[in-house]
Amino acid sequence: ATFGLNRTLSEQLRLSIDLTATDLAGTVSSAGVIGFPGTGTEIYTSLQLLASDLIVERDSHIIGLRYNDRERDRNYTLYFNSRFRIGKEFRLNPRLRLDYKSGKLTDNKRLIIRPTVKMEYKVGKWLYLEFEGGFEYRDETFSQIEQTTTGNYIYTGYRGIF
């Protein structure tokens, strides 16, 4: 079952809330295909605050929170996403995402922090040049083994809209 609510708070602000509950039944093995157990009740929630024209004209911002409660774990996500138009051809899109997962049946846990920035430049009527770069910090414990990793990425490309 899913329930969603969208509400305009002001000319610049909108609120969005979604709630989903599932309970998938398991299957039995049959004709050589291995069955799987049911999931139990799983709850997925999402809350977003959407804003526009806050800092500069035609900017947009999303602040969001997600929470998932499943049989084996809980997941929390907090994210920020902004988009700024600079002139007619250039867009700047800074983002930040924080994920935390904790096990219910074990002490497993994971924290991921991902700041990224995307830039887009419009060349002509249909061609866009894109650049995206980001960093990831990951701290996790799995089967009582702690591990911290970091990484960077850079993506460049083009996109045509015909």
Task: List each model region and its residues.
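Gram-negative and organellar
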Residues: 1-162
